[in-house]
């Protein structure tokens, strides 16, 4: 559509806005990083002999089956250590103070697992850090290797990037007892270190940032 523009007469004035009066606020498209509060890990026992280690099932598919193999490893290789498998009293999305209180009262350390999906791996990592930093229980989390970066991000943002963890192959769900035993008795696919060597070191060796 054509526009008709009137030509200003010689004695007319044209008002032009002062560009200096207009201010624009520009925000970074990267956003603002969240504040991270550094947390302190629990003190480690010199020995686990005669002590109780809790194996915490976070109620993901077949997690408890892998923890049974961890319990079997202790019975075979460290019979002086007592173990107890407990399942969360609620779903992994919620904190479980009742279970944590029991572990703090009766346990020397905890092994939490298994993080083997994009939502349960963060859940396992969070529960492990809760036990470490709020209840003073040395804790190692077990995850599958596909979620190592997710776990690293969660622990960093939670203020304990050095939180101890060990990895087993993916998947855990649907595997036989023999296959899960091979996971536990085998090597961490990311580090090449035996899984249970990492676990024992994780609950008995002081953490360093």
Task: Please provide the spans of the model-predicted regions.
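N-terminal amphipathic/basic leader segments beginning at the initiator methionine
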Residues: 2-42
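Structural motif
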Residues: 37-38, 90-101
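Glycine-rich phosphate/diphosphate-binding loop of Rossmann-like nucleotide-binding domains
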Residues: 51-76, 81
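Short beta-strand elements in bilobed, periplasmic/extracellular small-molecule ligand-binding domains
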Residues: 76-89, 162-170
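Short, well-structured alpha-helical segments in soluble
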Residues: 97-108, 127-130
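Short Gly/Thr/Asp-enriched flexible loops that form oxyanion-binding sites at enzyme active sites
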Residues: 120-132
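Active-site-proximal loop->helix
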Residues: 133, 148-161
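A charged, well-structured terminal subsegment
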Residues: 167-209
